[in-house]
């Protein structure tokens, strides 16, 4: 596969909480689409090992959701470090998109970028500084065309790969219903 500057990198992180100064990344997944939002590559889905102390410090919401999804058990069993996850993810991305070409794509991607900046700077640097944040479009559609919102329902599994797949599907929906292109 030849790397293409028009391809888009989609990323999702699962974290122990919302504060990068305190919380940690526990899962990362990436997908690459072409410019028409067709998935052309799936990167590694990596549970990142964190200590029992880090996991025990999670609030009730994170304990519940990451426990029910099996992610906490996967994190405990994982031997993967943040540095290893970065190296594997970049090795995947290099096949599809040159460094600095793709905006960071996903839902509420500003939060992911904050954690990448703190714990995975080399990966954060792989992206263009711009974002394609599907949640921005969702917020506008909710205000400008609320009836359109009923046509797309997310599963909200809080599992990184499924969340990215839903983000892409959501943008495809908005493209066809709102942008009509």
UniProtKB/Swiss-Prot annotation:
Residues 8-171 form the Exonuclease domain. Its EC number is 3.1.15.-. GO terms for biological process: DNA metabolic process. Transmembrane segments: none annotated. Gene3D superfamilies: Ribonuclease H-like superfamily/Ribonuclease H. Keywords: Cytoplasm, Exonuclease, Hydrolase, Nuclease. It is found in: Cytoplasm. Pfam families: RNase_T. CDD domains: Orn. GO terms for molecular function: 3'-5'-RNA exonuclease activity; nucleic acid binding. It is an enzyme of class 3 (hydrolase). The keyword Ion transport does not apply. It comes from the Bacteria. The active site is at residue 129. GO terms for cellular component: cytoplasm. 3'-to-5' exoribonuclease specific for small oligoribonucleotides. Belongs to the oligoribonuclease family. This is Oligoribonuclease. It comes from Shewanella baltica (strain OS155 / ATCC BAA-1091). The lineage of its organism: Bacteria, Pseudomonadati, Pseudomonadota, Gammaproteobacteria, Alteromonadales.
